[in-house]
């Protein structure tokens, strides 16, 4: 039993050391005719808030990805943090700021444009940014 406990501890220690960050990928389906309007709401309201959290050091990076050609998930954003706990803290702070600054009519408008969304949470196993530690 003692050996099993040590193996479990070792397994989690190896996985924790292998993790190089935490990624949240939010994907949204927006009707083609409303893409530009949805992108503008992000540009005007959401992107500046997530960018602030990067500048404040709460998150490592924030990216918004869009396309008009490919699959139906055409408005996507990604947040990278150092770990899951940091993500939860940044997510809470980000949405607190979003809900306090985005006018309700703009929030409702974005929700009307969003046909469906999904969130994926990943442990970042490898990331290279070219910076020397």
At which residue positions do the language-model features occur?
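Short, solvent-exposed loop/turn and secondary-structure capping segments
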Residues: 39, 75, 88-92
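Acidic helix-start/capping segments at beta-turn-to-alpha-helix junctions
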Residues: 60-78
């Amino acid at each position: 039993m003692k050996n099993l406990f040590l193996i479990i501890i070792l397994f989690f220690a190896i996985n924790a050391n292998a993790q190089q960050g935490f990624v949240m990928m939010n994907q949204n389906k927006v009707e083609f005719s409303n893409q530009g309007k949805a992108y503008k709401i992000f540009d005007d309201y959401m992107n500046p808030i997530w960018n602030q959290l990067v500048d404040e050091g709460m998150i490592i990076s924030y990216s918004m990805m869009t396309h008009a050609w490919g699959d139906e998930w055409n408005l996507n954003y990604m947040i990278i943090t150092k770990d899951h706990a940091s993500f939860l803290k940044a997510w809470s702070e980000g949405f607190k700021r979003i809900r306090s600054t985005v006018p309700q009519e703009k929030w409702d408008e974005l929700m009307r444009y969003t046909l469906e969304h999904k969130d994926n949470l990943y442990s970042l196993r490898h990331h290279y940014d070219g910076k020397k530690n």
